[in-house]
């Protein structure tokens, strides 16, 4: 659970707004907003029926953004994601018909149920910020955010994302089942209708884009950068790790921390930000040795072990 600290007035409203729909998932709402602020993307892994789709819809509605959904299936084609060129007999020219990737907030539902080729079409668009169809390049919407969902790998009919593709996601999150009381609240909220239907924007899309630009003005001093690098480099030296976190992971953790600091109405990063975010930012970028997997060792546990061994820089601390 995140440490207790006041949120940015505007962004705090969005968090509470999402929490009206997603009972008991405040931390997931905060992390999703942080990823969107950092211009990153989120991979949400969990069993069906825990509210992954509602989370993305609530996020989109809270900032007045255009929401698109892609339901990934084994027969989905790359053009079903990126769009196609259609011949117009009247103009005798080909016209681009946009795919769902052209939305602001895109739900890539069950991404591990489609072929690697179609997965790549989405992931390359996420990386480049554009799509190319028949030689023509189209820029993606601004803001642009993908929340991809996947079922756990033990489910049948899945195509696991390779490590190089997982690296494209800022965070990998799990929602989990609600508690007894939370599930009671869900039933009460949906007794007559779903609260998502009456959700209104609390931040204008243009204001959110401005806040995204403000993230780069959040300071991460040298001690914070050294702290990040030391943690990341130790993932490459750990005996259970076959492939450690790349420099892209270091950058991702710093950007995530800057966004998280802004969300908490600060213009500087503190060690608490790194400690809280590292378990969501680093483990999915690591490949463990087969014997470590066989022994049940988890990448997240390795990250926590490393953080417990790395000296924390002395800085201003958040109020807990």
Curated annotation (Swiss-Prot):
Q: Which residues fall in a coiled-coil region?
A: none
Q: GO molecular function: any one?
A: ATP hydrolysis activity
Checking SUPFAM superfamilies in the record gives: P-loop containing nucleoside triphosphate hydrolases (SSF52540)
Residue sites binding ATP per the record: 46-53
Q: Which CDD domains match?
A: AAA (cd00009)
Q: Could you identify this protein by its name?
A: Uncharacterized protein YeaC
Q: Which UniProt keywords apply?
A: ATP-binding, Nucleotide-binding
| Record-linked InterPro entries | ATPase_AAA-3 (IPR011703), CbbQ/NirQ/NorQ/GpvN (IPR050764), ChlI/MoxR_AAA_lid (IPR041628), P-loop_NTPase (IPR027417)
């Amino acid at each position: 659970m995140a440490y207790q600290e006041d949120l940015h007035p505007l962004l705090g409203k969005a968090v509470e707004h999402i929490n009206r729909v997603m009972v008991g998932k405040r931390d997931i709402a905060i992390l999703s907003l942080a990823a969107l602020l950092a211009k990153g993307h989120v991979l949400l892994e969990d069993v069906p029926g825990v509210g992954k789709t509602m989370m993305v819809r609530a996020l989109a509605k809270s900032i007045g953004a255009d929401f698109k959904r892609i339901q990934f299936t084994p027969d989905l084609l790359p053009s079903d994601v990126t769009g196609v060129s259609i011949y117009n007999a009247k103009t005798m020219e080909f016209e681009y018909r946009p795919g769902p990737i052209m939305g602001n907030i895109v739900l890539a539902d069950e991404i591990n149920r489609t072929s690697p080729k179609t997965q790549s079409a989405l992931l390359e668009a996420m990386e480049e910020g554009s799509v190319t169809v028949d030689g023509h390049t189209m820029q993606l919407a601004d803001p642009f955010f993908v929340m991809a969902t996947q079922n756990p790998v033990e489910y049948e009919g899945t195509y696991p994302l390779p490590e190089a593709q997982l690296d494209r996601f800022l965070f990998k999150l799990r929602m989990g089942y609600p508690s007894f009381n939370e599930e009671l609240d869900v039933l009460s909220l949906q007794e007559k209708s779903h609260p998502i239907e009456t959700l209104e924007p609390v931040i204008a899309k243009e204001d959110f884009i401005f806040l995204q630009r403000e993230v780069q003005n959040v300071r991460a001093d040298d001690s914070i950068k050294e702290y990040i690098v030391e943690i990341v480099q130790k993932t490459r030296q750990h005996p259970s790790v076959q492939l450690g976190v790349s420099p892209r992971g270091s950058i991702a953790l710093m950007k995530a921390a800057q966004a998280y600091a802004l969300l908490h109405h600060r213009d500087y990063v503190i060690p608490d930000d790194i400690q809280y975010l590292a378990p969501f930012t680093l483990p999915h970028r690591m490949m463990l040795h087969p014997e470590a997997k066989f022994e049940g060792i988890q990448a997240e546990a390795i990250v926590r072990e490393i953080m417990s061994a790395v000296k924390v820089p002395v800085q201003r601390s958040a109020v807990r």
